[in-house]
Amino acid sequence: MESTNKTWTELMTPLSQFWLESSSQAWKNWFDLMAKGGAGAMMGSAPQSFESLPQQFLQSQQFYGELLKLSFEAWQSLWPKLDNGSAPGAVQGYLKQLQTQIEQYTATTQALQGDMDGLWQCYIKEVQRFSQLWLSTWQSSVAPLGKLPTGDIHAWLDLNNLYGDALYNKNLSSFMRSPLLGPSREMNGKLLRAFDDWVKLSQAMADYQLLEADIQYRGFAALMEDLLARAKEDKPVKTWKEFQQRWAIAADQVFEEAFCEEKNLKVRGKFINALNRYRIQQQEILEAWLKMLNLPTRSEVDEIHQTIYQLRKEVKSLKKRLGETEANPG
């Protein structure tokens, strides 16, 4: 038994050093790309009307970058601990740290939503009594708060929806749908409806990003279990390509199981529907501004393209008939 342990140690030590040295630079370049890449540059040139979406995507990209970085640091630390049997405890520590990051991300999202609703506090005071509002919200939050220690991600989603309903849907949302007066009432109505859809989109996006973060966390846990199992079977990961393959296999299984659940599909469907509604309102506002500037709207351009397409088909058909007539003059 001692000779087996010596052989295992002698094999694993140079192998772990080789793997870490060969992969460190690749990971460093990847983290730099995640921190300085596409989303940050895209925000600088994004139109003002689309500014909020790149900010949300950048926040999500940074969160996933930290998740990847933590997964690599976890494996880097676990590798030399395989011999002394302390790797399972270290895995639990890193998983707990990941769960803490997800909770911090959720708290930040809720704080941002609270700041946005604070801009309309003057309207809320006129429509609702805060004493009744917060008492009802506090009573409704007891059940979701009781689920948090169990690690149920949908408890965070329930709290997010509860706060959004208390701060916006019960008071300011009805004000947005109130009748408008004046010559500019049509344009003002479109702007208010677009703002209402944007608030609902922000809430749905926060829920969907939180769901994705939880799935990433579970995918990381599955990856760590797979790597530990392979190491114990004397089949350690030796190359960066093999590490990517194991990560993809573990993540695919977790994502497939997660998005087969009905409650997760509802969160995703809510986000897609909210995005589509917001884009429709955005298109209506854009067309109204284009009409004011005597510029062709998207609908008019689409009609022109459709007309040109039909004319091209008719010309092609006429040329074909003309060619047949010339070939058979009799």
Swiss-Prot record:
Q: Which UniProt keywords apply?
A: Coiled coil, Cytoplasm, PHB biosynthesis
Q: Which domain of life is it from?
A: Bacteria
Pathway in which this enzyme or protein is active: Biopolymer metabolism; poly-(R)-3-hydroxybutanoate biosynthesis
Q: In Gene Ontology terms, what is a biological process of this protein? A: poly-hydroxybutyrate biosynthetic process
InterPro entries, alphabetically?
A: PHA_synth_III_E (IPR010123)
Q: Where in the cell is it found?
A: Cytoplasm
GO CC, sorted alphabetically, is:
cytoplasm
A Pfam family cross-referenced in the UniProt record is PHA_synth_III_E
The regions listed as transmembrane in this protein's record are: none
Please state the biotechnological applications recorded for this protein. Poly(3-hydroxyalkanoic acids) (PHA), of which PHB is among the most common compounds, are prokaryotic intracellular storage compounds with potential uses as renewable, biodegradable thermoplastics. Cyanobacterial PHB synthesis is particularly attractive as cyanobacteria use CO(2) as the carbon source.
Record's miscellaneous remark = Nitrogen-free medium induces chlorosis in Synechocystis, leading to the degradation of the photosynthetic apparatus and concomitant accumulation of cytoplasmic polyhydroxyalkanoic acid (PHA) granules which in this cyanobacterium are composed of PHB.
Q: What does this protein do?
A: When expressed in E.coli with Synechocystis PhaC and C.necator PhaA and PhaB, confers the ability to synthesize up to 13% (w/w) poly(3-hydroxybutyrate) (PHB) depending on the carbon source; all 4 genes are necessary for PHB production. Cell-free in vitro coexpression with PhaE gives a heterodimer able to polymerize 3-hydroxybutyrate-CoA. This subunit has no catalytic activity but enhances the activity of PhaC, the catalytic subunit.
Official protein name in the record: Poly(3-hydroxyalkanoate) polymerase subunit PhaE
Q: Which organism is it from?
A: Synechocystis sp. (strain ATCC 27184 / PCC 6803 / Kazusa)
